[in-house]
């Protein structure tokens, strides 16, 4: 009897091994396909740290072979569906489903890159897996009126906000020191809860002529290059928000945990490819924004800014509490970028109208509003990941977690696994 049971166990393990091998081959096909699309669409691949053997061997064609890619996507999705239906493993089903979600985004991005038009809602649903709530003009007016009561002084709400914020503008010659200090402290906070690989590190560079404020270029092997755009003025809160978002416990930590736990420990080859326009980005951006508040609860953020960052920047600490109170209210206006993206993509709003919305309802200066328009024109519905992605991640992490330590633990689970968007809702 023992021999028979042992024989059955061998058969089971053998069957599981064959199934896993088949899924691995599909995962390799997914990576090859993504890298080949990336030969044409320079924004398609955000990071890749897998084997060189999966990179394209042939030079790209003179024209974008959209139909070829769409056909390959369709075949691969069908193969994944078949593999999932035959599998008795919940982990394998989830893995196949996660890759399929990514491939749905591949399909939409290929269509966008080839010039096919779609509405904002279809695009956001296919790329990021969500239906994005609409925020009316009345919504923004309500919070503007609330801010008007909070901000004292003459002039418009925008002028009053700018008068307050300019007190906390970081001098250009202090940016390096302030940001490196913020990143180092963010790492300390994160290391209290996550075991970080000894070899991990982030470098910091300052750049110009970009449509974004900060970017994490993940290099693989637990290394990142963080870039901060200095085209526009950088205020003191951004030293924490951007630095933490891009590094600890944001993008750098998200990528290294996936690499360690899935690619290196489990051999999930698909995780070595990070396609920018995919459901993975909703979790990446949402978790990076949520992680700022986790590492810097309001009281700690205020104390660290007041006692450490402002003195380093050579700035007066008077008014910082009121400034942070206003910024907390102003967060409610972040959805304005979604509505501007919706209007521009759907053709119901001109760039000039979009800029007016950003200045009026987002309390953005004209240079920042113009830079935001540039971002939307390039990245389109991607903007929803920063705010609606944050909402979904916050709901996921804070459900049934009563303490900060429990939230850190659930947050770590989110950053270490192939979590599908449906699991967040």
Say what each PLM segment does:
Residues 1-22:
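Bacterial Sec-dependent N-terminal signal peptides
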Residues 19-425:
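N-terminal maturation segment of proteins
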